[in-house]
Amino acid sequence: MNIKTGDKVRVIAGKDKGKEGSVTKVFLKTDRVIVEGVNKVKKHQKPTQAEPKGGIIEKEAAIHVSNVMLLDASKKKTIRASKRESNKK
């Protein structure tokens, strides 16, 4: 996968199309990423000893890698992420 934690990305598909954010977590096995401030979902939290106040919380859900593109910080344009192989050893 060519997207790493901390990369700036733009969402190119889905309900949050056009939004930008930085990658906070990468799931390599499922090819998904969590982007800061994007794809918010509401989760019903049960009260526990660690979190005595339950209720409905908002958190970011994972997005498939095919729905995001790397963002070039200098030009503010999206770029295609690809691996380059060199013939050097």
UniProtKB/Swiss-Prot annotation:
Keywords: Ribonucleoprotein, Ribosomal protein, RNA-binding, rRNA-binding. GO terms for biological process: translation. It comes from the Bacteria. SUPFAM superfamilies: Translation proteins SH3-like domain. GO terms for molecular function: rRNA binding; structural constituent of ribosome. Disulfide bonds: none annotated. InterPro entries: KOW, Rib_uL2_dom2, Ribosomal_uL24, Ribosomal_uL24_CS, Ribosomal_uL24_KOW, Translation_prot_SH3-like_sf. The keyword Ribonucleoprotein applies. The keyword Ribonucleoprotein applies. GO terms for cellular component: ribonucleoprotein complex; ribosome. PROSITE patterns: RIBOSOMAL_L24 (PS01108). It holds the Pfam family ribosomal_L24. Belongs to the universal ribosomal protein uL24 family. Part of the 50S ribosomal subunit. One of two assembly initiator proteins, it binds directly to the 5'-end of the 23S rRNA, where it nucleates assembly of the 50S subunit. One of the proteins that surrounds the polypeptide exit tunnel on the outside of the subunit. This is Large ribosomal subunit protein uL24. It comes from Oenococcus oeni (strain ATCC BAA-331 / PSU-1).
